[in-house]
Amino acid sequence: MEPEVKIERRKTRQVMVGNVPVGGDAPISVQSMTNSETCDVDATVGQIRRLQDAGVDIVRVSVPSMEAAEAFGKIRKQVDVPLVADIHYDYKIALAVAEQGVDCLRINPGNIGREDRIKAVIQCAKDKGLPIRIGVNAGSLEKELQRKYGEPTSDALVESALRHADILDRYDFQNFKVSVKASNVFMTLQAYRKLSSQLEQPLHLGVTEAGTFRSGTVKSAVALGALLMEGIGDTIRVSLAADPVEEVRVGFDILKSLNLRKKGVNIIACPSCSRQNFDVIKTVNELEARLEDINESVDLAVIGCLVNGPGEAREVDVGLTGGTPNNLAYRDGEKSHHITADDLVDELERMVRAKVKKQREDEEKGIIARSE
């Protein structure tokens, strides 16, 4: 078997967003953002709980008004995931939401205003022990930088970030992370590469306004994947014009593809052709939906014929090779038993869940053994 490639990550300071470490040697965390009206407490709480079910590490909530800041406090009491307050324009909202149990304040250098306002936010964050994210966006750069560069560029994004990092540094505040997002993949890549060589703070990766589910997934996978392979990035958010739960799924899939996080069922499936002995696409789609609740790492291969099936099945936890008259199942790389086409989904689900149960039992035994 090909040896697993280990990505050497850039060493950064570590900050804590609630109970989730970001930076240092911490696992790369996956974030998402609610798209409900924050003042609709029930809707926002419901969405956050769905994100938690999907495995999200950190959730950002827009706080556009004092009313939203008050609603944030009610939301905070009903969920137990770290929450970031997304603040634009009015620094006083940041001060207000800091009293409501927030875990991190995101400010936008392009619209937060004068240095005295930033100083007030810094002092508040110090008093409350909160980290700050300097969130630079190509679409909302400071007017001065817009005039200087004429249009958004990677240099403009980096200059904005470094200016505000310098402000935080002058007020002896190091508990922050930074993002420099653009909707253009190349601008995003260049900005993060330049910034990573000039700051020791953790970097929050993302392609802003990436697009629809399909196009946004592609852009994010290309940009974030390239940066992560270079060891750049400590937390990610995949921005999609879609259900926020999809952002979490795509985020984890990006990390899983690079062996940076192990979570959930990794389905390996052929694209299918006329050699398939069962409906591969229908089978894997149904399996993916049924196995969404699993957080343990399990590799499942579903291959429609004998060309590549045995080779793939021998490398995974649970495998299936299409055959005539019946399909052959593999368990831990060894041939196990035959399955008819009608029983494929039920039997593969049973095998995966049995594997998960065994993993949990082995982990429990290990914990008991270590405690003795």
From Swiss-Prot:
One of its GO terms (molecular function) is 4-hydroxy-3-methylbut-2-en-1-yl diphosphate synthase activity (ferredoxin). Belongs to the IspG family. This is 4-hydroxy-3-methylbut-2-en-1-yl diphosphate synthase (flavodoxin). It is an enzyme of class 1 (oxidoreductase). Converts 2C-methyl-D-erythritol 2,4-cyclodiphosphate (ME-2,4cPP) into 1-hydroxy-2-methyl-2-(E)-butenyl 4-diphosphate. InterPro entries: Dihydropteroate_synth-like_sf (IPR011005), IspG_bac (IPR016425), IspG_bac-typ (IPR004588), NO2/SO3_Rdtase_4Fe4S_sf (IPR045854). GO terms for biological process: isopentenyl diphosphate biosynthetic process, methylerythritol 4-phosphate pathway; terpenoid biosynthetic process. Binds 1 [4Fe-4S] cluster. The lineage of its organism: Bacteria, Pseudomonadati, Pseudomonadota, Gammaproteobacteria, Oceanospirillales. Pathway: Isoprenoid biosynthesis; isopentenyl diphosphate biosynthesis via DXP pathway; isopentenyl diphosphate from 1-deoxy-D-xylulose 5-phosphate: step 5/6. It comes from Alcanivorax borkumensis (strain ATCC 700651 / DSM 11573 / NCIMB 13689 / SK2). The gene is ispG.
